[in-house]
């Protein structure tokens, strides 16, 4: 469960930092009226993920974009080397970005600024917008809890969506492996139990159930060894019976 726990921890940390950065750098607030509302949130293939929407809105879309990027950079910097090693593959799978551990921050910043400053995003004046994510996995017995932070602008929400695509892609890569690993561990345990049971039955049979040949061997082994002189003494102590030939004739 370690990988799933680390993903959930990263998701929580990222959400907290985004909220904090939006508040500090973009004057965002949960009480500010949002120009854009999230209508529906779709996960095309949902395998154990929960979602909540949180409003942290402001009027400064550019500051929102910078705040989200700052939160993402700090969160990435706090990952372990092992966790960072997974990130480039996540970028390729989720955003079709070819990157490396050393350039991932710069590449993500370039992607977000180029994508979220495009006319398709900036000119989107819809007051109610929908968000669509491909798929998300939760670990067995431990659902992944996601939080989409509505910034109130198309730019800010574009950056938030890019981050969510990355985090959900991470769940699709790690959680299924855990399921497979759990199955392997289960069969390993079953095989181990069968082997131990077979050994127990073998020794129990040897101890509790003795074959006829083994019984004979045990009797002979426990029988007193008699010296040959004992047989001589017995012979001479016992008077032999003499049968006369005349008696036989009669």
UniProtKB/Swiss-Prot annotation:
Top-level lineage group: Viruses
Gene name of the encoded protein: OPG099
Localization annotation: Virion membrane
InterPro entries linked: Virion_mem_poxvirus_L1
Membrane topology of this protein: Single-pass membrane protein
Region called Targeting to MV membrane, residue ranges: 2-12
Lineage: Viruses, Varidnaviria, Bamfordvirae, Nucleocytoviricota, Pokkesviricetes
UniProt record, GO biological process: symbiont entry into host cell; virion attachment to host cell
PTM statement from Swiss-Prot or TrEMBL: Myristoylated. Disulfid bonds are oxidized in the cytoplasm by OPG088 protein.
UniProt keyword list: Disulfide bond, Host-virus interaction, Late protein, Lipoprotein, Membrane, Myristate, Transmembrane, Transmembrane helix, Viral attachment to host cell, Viral envelope protein, Viral penetration into host cytoplasm, Virion, Virus entry into host cell
N-myristoyl glycine lipid modification positions: 2
Disulphide bond pairs: 34-57, 49-136, 116-158
Claim: Transferase is one of the keywords in the record: no
Main location as per UniProt: virion
Intravirion-facing ranges: 205-250
Induction: Expressed in the late phase of the viral replicative cycle.
GO cellular component: membrane; viral envelope; virion membrane
Protein source organism: Vaccinia virus (strain Copenhagen)
Keyword Aminoacyl-tRNA synthetase carried by entry: no
Family classification: Belongs to the orthopoxvirus OPG095 family.
Virion surface domain ranges by topology: 2-183
Quaternary structure and interacting proteins, as annotated: Component of the entry fusion complex (EFC) composed of OPG053, OPG076, OPG086, OPG094, OPG095, OPG099, OPG107, OPG143, OPG104, OPG147 and OPG155. Except for OPG095 and OPG053, each of the EFC proteins is required for assembly or stability of the complex.
This protein's name: Entry-fusion complex associated protein OPG095
Function field: Component of the entry fusion complex (EFC), which consists of 11 proteins. During cell infection, this complex mediates entry of the virion core into the host cytoplasm by a two-step mechanism consisting of lipid mixing of the viral and cellular membranes and subsequent pore formation.
Membrane-spanning residues: 184-204
């Amino acid at each position: 469960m370690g990988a799933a726990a680390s993903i959930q921890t990263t998701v929580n940390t990222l959400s907290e930092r985004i909220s904090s950065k939006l508040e500090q750098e973009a004057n965002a607030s949960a009480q500010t009226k949002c120009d854009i509302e999230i209508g529906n949130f779709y996960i095309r293939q949902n395998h154990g993920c929960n979602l909540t929407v949180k409003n942290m809105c402001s009027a400064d879309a550019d500051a929102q974009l910078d705040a989200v990027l700052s939160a993402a950079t700090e969160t990435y910097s706090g990952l372990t080397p092992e966790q960072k090693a997974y990130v480039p593959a996540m970028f390729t799978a989720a955003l079709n970005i070819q990157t490396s551990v050393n350039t991932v921050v710069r590449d993500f910043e370039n992607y977000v600024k180029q994508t979220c400053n495009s006319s398709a995003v900036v000119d989107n004046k819809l007051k109610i917008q929908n968000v669509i994510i491909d798929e998300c996995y939760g670990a067995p017995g431990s659902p992944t809890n996601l939080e989409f932070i509505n910034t109130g602008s198309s730019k800010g929400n574009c950056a938030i969506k890019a981050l969510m695509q990355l985090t959900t892609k991470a769940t699709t890569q790690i959680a299924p492996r855990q399921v497979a690993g759990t199955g392997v561990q289960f069969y390993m345990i079953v095989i181990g139990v069968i082997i131990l049971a077979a050994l127990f039955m073998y020794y129990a049979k040897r101890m509790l159930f003795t074959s006829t040949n083994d019984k004979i061997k045990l009797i002979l082994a426990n029988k007193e060894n008699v010296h040959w002189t004992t047989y001589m003494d017995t012979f001479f102590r016992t008077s032999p019976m003499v049968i006369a030939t005349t008696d036989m004739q009669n």
